[in-house]
Amino acid sequence: MSLSSLLWAFWYILPAYFANASPVLVGGGRPIDGGRYWKDGRRVFGDGKTWRGLIGGVAIGTAVGALQYFITPEFYGSLGKALLLAFLLSFGALFGDLVGSFFKRRIDLPRGSPAIGLDQLGFLISALAFAYPVKTLDSGQIIFLLVVSPFVHWGANYFAYKMGWKSVPW
Amino acid sequence: MSLSSLLWAFWYILPAYFANASPVLVGGGRPIDGGRYWKDGRRVFGDGKTWRGLIGGVAIGTAVGALQYFITPEFYGSLGKALLLAFLLSFGALFGDLVGSFFKRRIDLPRGSPAIGLDQLGFLISALAFAYPVKTLDSGQIIFLLVVSPFVHWGANYFAYKMGWKSVPW
């Protein structure tokens, strides 16, 4: 495992990180569950998961992929492949986040409360799974991302909290 | 991704699953933190993490690896490599679990309360990282294990709860 292979792993996953972080900035609006309740009497996803956050996050992540293609075209091969990869990483990240919210509501964690592990890893695993058919990393790079992403995630959230973008530091 | 490659992924990770599950059966005894408190006034790991659970779990996981070698020697190459791999997978799994307990105590989750995600993925990621230098999987197999392990984990814990081995179903 060379240093450059670890940097390429971050470069690969960047759209997923942007998509996962962007609802903090572009979120709000109509909730995806339309205010509906699950059969346990609790919200399906909650007010924290909105269409604007989902669509905005996928758009931002995919735009990041377009920028990445123009910086390192040889890493992607073609603009079409770069855009498809970034779309799948972004959609995968937000889909994983949504599934996480579903499980958090089911065990009755209130919106915004931490699910230590799920919040830091669910979006990443989902992004890796969605993007796998188009382009993947080697196993060492994946293990590296899994080990360091929780710390990146906590650092980024603490920064967003200090900047006043989030009301809680996780 | 063929079916057999997914079955090999389970076969590879089996010592980690056994090590992670075994403290339920062989646990108890003297806690690893010796009853000591962290500077936040809470226990370092708590009474749930004991020397007997750690050593018993590593022993059971490594014994599983020895059995695996005699069933599929060609997968490991040599008994020494199979034992080393099983030891690293088992120790890695329990080390990840211990780190998870440390973080759970820091955010003041009581012993046994669920950290959705961390409990299902922390031991797995740690096992994969420790075992990586000896033998690893391909990226598709790793992503597969990450996606399905939470469900295996929940199923196994629910079974242990129904059998009366655990007091809570998670």
Curated annotation (Swiss-Prot), chains A, B:
One of its GO terms (biological process) is glycerophospholipid biosynthetic process. Its EC number is 2.7.7.67. GO terms for cellular component: plasma membrane. The chain crosses the membrane at residues 6-26, 53-73, 83-103, 114-134, 140-160. Keywords: Cell membrane, Lipid biosynthesis, Lipid metabolism, Magnesium, Membrane, Phospholipid biosynthesis, Phospholipid metabolism, Transferase, Transmembrane, Transmembrane helix. It is found in: Cell membrane. The keyword Iron does not apply. It is an enzyme of class 2 (transferase). It comes from the Archaea. It is a multi-pass membrane protein. PANTHER family: CDP-ARCHAEOL SYNTHASE. This is CDP-archaeol synthase. It comes from Thermococcus onnurineus (strain NA1). The lineage of its organism: Archaea, Methanobacteriati, Methanobacteriota, Thermococci, Thermococcales. The gene is carS.
